[in-house]
UniProtKB/Swiss-Prot annotation:
Residues where substrate binds: 25, 69, 111, 124, 192-199, 241
Catalytic activity: a 5'-end NAD(+)-phospho-ribonucleoside in mRNA + H2O = a 5'-end phospho-adenosine-phospho-ribonucleoside in mRNA + beta-nicotinamide D-ribonucleotide + 2 H(+); NAD(+) + H2O = beta-nicotinamide D-ribonucleotide + AMP + 2 H(+); NADH + H2O = reduced beta-nicotinamide D-ribonucleotide + AMP + 2 H(+)
Name of protein: NAD-capped RNA hydrolase NudC
Biological classification of the source: Bacteria, Pseudomonadati, Pseudomonadota, Gammaproteobacteria, Enterobacterales
Its biological purpose: mRNA decapping enzyme that specifically removes the nicotinamide adenine dinucleotide (NAD) cap from a subset of mRNAs by hydrolyzing the diphosphate linkage to produce nicotinamide mononucleotide (NMN) and 5' monophosphate mRNA. The NAD-cap is present at the 5'-end of some mRNAs and stabilizes RNA against 5'-processing. Has preference for mRNAs with a 5'-end purine. Catalyzes the hydrolysis of a broad range of dinucleotide pyrophosphates.
CDD domains according to UniProt: NUDIX_NADH_pyrophosphatase_Nudt13 (cd03429)
UniProt EC number: 3.6.1.-, 3.6.1.22
Residues engaged in binding a divalent metal cation 3: 174, 178, 219
Cofactor(s) required, per the database record: Mg(2+); Mn(2+); Zn(2+)
Binding of Zn(2+), residues: 98, 101, 116, 119
Enzyme class per UniProt: hydrolase
Length: 257
């Protein structure tokens, strides 16, 4: 439940509006509320990090509003909490009125939800499940450059899970649609909340089965097999894509060195 910020309140401050994050001096604000002109605003505690509270403040600032991507190099847990704050702020902003009856809604006191004051409908933050998969063929890994990433970064394949589809089916479909190949021996690795805008990445490793690379030009600029010791520019550390690539490289080193 949110409350009014007092002078001595302290912690990490996720100040967000319209999926933007306030980053004075390029950093996530930390310290006493008075230092950031937050006293008197409403705040909701959304977690803790290193024993300090993490607060969400739904507010637009005139300057230094940026993307949560700018704090991706933070500790993984703090980055996740910043992402949670941005997603919750957008959820509360976009769910002021009920989609069924049009009446005003109010936040739940017990969970991340909005409740309709008229028809009692309950809304939760939208989470979009996605798959991301590293595909290995002998001593090489399949890496692609996506159309939305024109900075030279090559990464593994990923995509959204469709309605009525299992995660395993989503992997097979996305890989076939984007690269034209089939995979086998699928293995779950880990997951990562990814607030761009509200994804939950489920990470897998797989082995090449059959087929030649035929890219979907709407999704990819190019895709190729890269030997584990001769890789192109990769996603930054801290991303689940980077972990999948590094895990695949480690497996190749164990077998080929």
């Amino acid at each position: 439940m949110d409350r009014i910020i007092e002078k001595l309140d302290h912690g990490w401050w996720v100040v967000s509006h319209e999926q933007k994050l306030w980053l004075p001096k390029g950093e996530l604000p930390y310290g006493e509320a008075a230092n950031f002109d937050l006293v008197g605003q409403r705040a909701l505690q959304i977690g803790e990090w290193q024993g300090e509270p993490v607060w969400l403040v739904q507010q637009q600032r005139r300057h230094d509003m940026g993307s949560v991507r700018q704090v991706i190099d933070l500790d993984v847990r703090l980055f996740q909490l910043a992402g949670r704050g941005v997603q919750l702020a957008e959820f509360y902003r976009s769910h002021k009125y009920c989609g069924y009856c049009g009446h005003e809604m109010y936040p739940s006191k017990t969970e991340w939800a909005m409740l309709c004051s008229h028809c009692r409908e309950r809304y939760y933050p939208q989470i979009a499940p996605c798959i991301i998969v590293a595909i290995r063929r002998d001593d090489s890994i399949l890496l692609a450059q996506h159309t939305r990433h024109r900075n030279g970064v090559h990464t593994v394949l990923a995509g959204f899970v469709e309605v009525g589809e299992t995660l395993e089916q989503a992997v097979a479909r996305e890989v076939m649609e984007e690269s034209g190949i089939k995979v086998k021996n699928l293995r779950y690795v880990t997951s990562q909340p990814w607030p761009f805008p509200q994804s939950l990445m489920t990470a897998f490793m797989a082995e090449y089965d059959s087929g030649d690379i035929v890219i979907d030009p709407k999704e990819l600029l190019e895709a190729n097999w890269y030997r584990y010791d001769d890789l192109p520019l990769l996603p930054p550390p801290g991303t689940v894509a980077r972990r999948l690539i590094e895990d695949t490289v480690a497996m190749c080193r164990a077998e080929y060195e």
